[in-house]
Swiss-Prot record:
This is Small ribosomal subunit protein bS6. GO terms for molecular function: small ribosomal subunit rRNA binding; structural constituent of ribosome. Belongs to the bacterial ribosomal protein bS6 family. Residues 124-139 have a biased composition (Acidic residues). Keywords: Ribonucleoprotein, Ribosomal protein, RNA-binding, rRNA-binding. It comes from Pseudomonas aeruginosa (strain ATCC 15692 / DSM 22644 / CIP 104116 / JCM 14847 / LMG 12228 / 1C / PRS 101 / PAO1). PROSITE patterns: RIBOSOMAL_S6. GO terms for biological process: translation. Residues 95-121 have a biased composition (Basic and acidic residues). Residues 95-139 are annotated as: Disordered. It comes from the Bacteria.
Length: 139
């Protein structure tokens, strides 16, 4: 069995169906004896250029180990599913299990955002405590 990296883009109106699609695709691979090494749902993102007058799409990344038969079935599913607007299958030399750069960058952005918001939350909590202490002193 060979290793593959698969990225597919789903029409934004069909984003609710992504979970079911991924489940069907992973089931087809695993039933044929393959493995899913990495599965990342990148969510809705802006496209570099419009595809069929669509400017956003739901991105999904999969790193799998599967047979040629399972891969052909997966590619047929992509081809005949109107919700999948683009797909790319690349053969890899080995399994990739670590997080993708896209997900790492998103997590670091979220961490920075949380750090920026924390000092404001602490300052508000301190002000609230001071006011309640002064209220208790008046009684």
């Amino acid at each position: 069995m060979r290793h593959y990296e698969i990225v597919f883009l789903v029409h934004p109106d069909q984003s609710e169906q992504v979970g079911g699609m991924v489940e069907r695709y992973t089931k087809a691979i695993e039933e044929d004896g393959g493995k899913i090494h990495r599965l990342e749902d990148w969510g809705r993102r802006q496209l570099a250029y419009a595809i069929n007058n669509v400017h956003k799409a739901h991105y999904v990344l999969m790193n799998v180990e599967c047979s040629a038969k399972a891969l052909a079935e997966l590619e047929d599913n992509f081809r005949y599913n109107d919700a999948v607007i683009r797909n790319l299958v690349m053969r890899r030399d080995e399994a990739v299990t670590e997080q993708s750069e896209m997900l790492k960058a998103e997590e670091s952005r979220n961490e920075r955002r949380e750090r920026r918001e924390r000092p404001n939350d602490n300052a508000e909590g301190a002000d609230g405590d001071d006011n309640s202490d002064s209220d208790n002193a008046d009684e």
